[in-house]
A protein has these predicted regions:
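Surface-exposed loop/turn motifs in large extracellular/passenger domains
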Residues: 1-27, 34-56, 63-86, 93-178, ...
Length: 206
C-alpha cells in the first residue's frame, strides 16, 4: 500500500490523527492507497482534524483493502478525506476488487462525528476491470463499501459491507460504473437518524 501493509499477508494498523496531512497516498498495483496490499489485512483509523487524499492502485481501494482484501476503515471527527478506488473495481473506501463473500469476510466502514467535529468525506469507486474484448470484466467499485468481482460466476456475491454512518457528516459518494454509491452487491444502504446539517450525496458515474 502507499501507506500500510505489504502484500500477501501484510497486517497492521494505520492511524492518522491530529492535524496530519496526507497528500496523494497512492497504492501500487493491487494495493490500496492507504491500507493493505494484495491479500492483506490492515485497519485504518483517521481522526482528529486530519486531511487525507488517497488513491488505490489497480484493483485496490483508495482507503481500505488491496486486491482480494477486506477494508476496515474508521473516519471520525473533523477530518477531510478524499479517496478514489483503483481501476478494476476497487472501492473508494472499503474493499479491494475480487473479494468474494462468505460469513467471515466483510468490509467494515464507519464514518461519524465526535467532539473534534464532523467529517467531510468524498469517495469515488474505481472504474471496471478492462476485459480483453473491449467489454468490462467487472463492474465499478462502490464509492463506500465493497469492491467488484472480476469475471464473476453468475451467482457469486461480493464480500458484504458493514457500513455505519453516525452523527453529523458530509459525504459525497460517486459509484464506479454500474456499482453502488454506498453499499455492496447492488444494494444501496440507507442511513437514518443523522444529525441536522448532514448531507449524503450519492451519484452514479456518468
Amino acid at each position: 500500500a502507499g501507506i500500510g501493509g505489504g502484500g500477501f499477508g501484510g497486517t497492521g494498523t494505520v492511524t492518522i490523527t491530529d492535524n496530519a496531512k496526507v497528500d496523494n497516498a497512492t497504492g501500487g498495483e493491487g494495493a490500496a492507497g492507504i491500507g493493505s496490499g494484495v491479500v492483506g489485512n490492515v485497519t485504518v483509523n483517521i481522526s482528529g482534524n486530519a486531511t487525507v487524499n488517497a488513491e488505490g492502485g489497480a484493483n485496490g481501494a483508495g482507503i481500505g483493502g488491496g486486491y482480494a482484501s477486506a477494508g476496515d476503515v474508521t473516519i471520525e471527527g473533523g477530518t477531510t478525506v478524499s479517496a478514489a478506488g483503483g481501476v478494476g473495481g476497487g472501492a473508494g473506501i472499503g474493499g479491494g476488487a475480487d473479494l468474494a463473500g462468505d460469513e467471515d469476510t466483510r468490509n467494515r466502514v464507519t464514518i461519524r462525528s465526535n467532539g473534534d467535529g464532523s467529517p467531510n468525506v468524498s469517495a469515488v469507486g474505481g472504474a471496471p476491470e478492462p476485459g480483453q474484448d473491449g467489454e468490462d470484466a467487472s463492474k465499478g467499485g462502490a464509492a463506500i463499501g465493497s469492491g467488484a468481482l472480476i469475471d464473476p460466476d453468475e451467482d457469486a456475491a461480493e464480500a458484504d459491507a458493514d457500513i455505519t454512518i453516525e452523527g453529523k457528516v458530509t459525504i459525497s459518494a460517486v459509484a464506479g460504473k454500474d456499482g453502488v454509491a454506498i453499499g455492496a452487491n447492488g444494494k444501496e444502504q440507507a442511513f437514518d437518524g443523522l444529525l441536522p446539517g448532514s448531507s449524503i450525496d450519492r451519484r452514479n458515474t456518468d
